[in-house]
């Protein structure tokens, strides 16, 4: 999940997109 968030450049946004 952290890797995906890192790619997006946002922690909260990355988590939302992942979910």
UniProtKB/Swiss-Prot annotation:
It comes from the Bacteria. Induction: Expressed in both exponential and stationary phase in rich medium; expression is higher in stationary phase (at protein level). This is Protein YbiE. The gene is ybiE.
